[in-house]
Amino acid sequence: IKFDLIMIKQTLHFFNKEKRTKLIKICKSNLRKNGVLVIFSLNTINNEIPCFKLMKQKLNRGLERDSRMIKFTCNMLKDNTIDKFKFKVLITKSKYIKMLKQKYISCLVNLNKKQINKGIKEIKDIYNKNIIFEDILICIKYKHI
């Protein structure tokens, strides 16, 4: 089976370099002529995601790794294009705290309950009732010719 579109959304960073390489090669080989591979990732610079101190440290470490991953991916996918999608986000502090408790972003996965609760206290102290920020996704687009 060949596909017209294959989309990978914010998951490549879960794989090691070898498995990422294999996945991208499999995706490329399973595209029809003029098929498109689209890979979404968080913007790696000037990220505005609301963070508590430990979360920011983990997020920045992950974004540095993601930056290297994106460069490597672009080298594998010759003649790619990169777009950025900007989303204005307005979320209540209480809703965001619920998301933190659910570990909505991968940099929170390895934090324990005590660390999350300490971070939530920081968020409560830092942010207003409504949290407004810009979320930016990078989109790498490769067309199989």
Over which residues does each language-model region extend?
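Short conserved loop adjoining the S-adenosyl-L-methionine
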Residues: 1-2
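A conserved beta-strand element that flanks and buttresses the S-adenosyl-L-methionine
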Residues: 7
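Short catalytic micro-motifs in class I SAM-dependent methyltransferases
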Residues: 10-14
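Short N-terminal helix/helix-N-cap motif within the alpha/beta-hydrolase-1
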Residues: 16-20
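A short glycine-rich, Lys/Arg-flanked "PGG" loop and its adjoining helix->strand segment in the class I
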Residues: 21-36
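Conserved class I S-adenosyl-L-methionine
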Residues: 36-66
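Acceptor-substrate binding/catalytic loop of class I
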Residues: 55-72, 83-88, 106-111
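Conserved Class I S-adenosyl-L-methionine
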Residues: 80-145
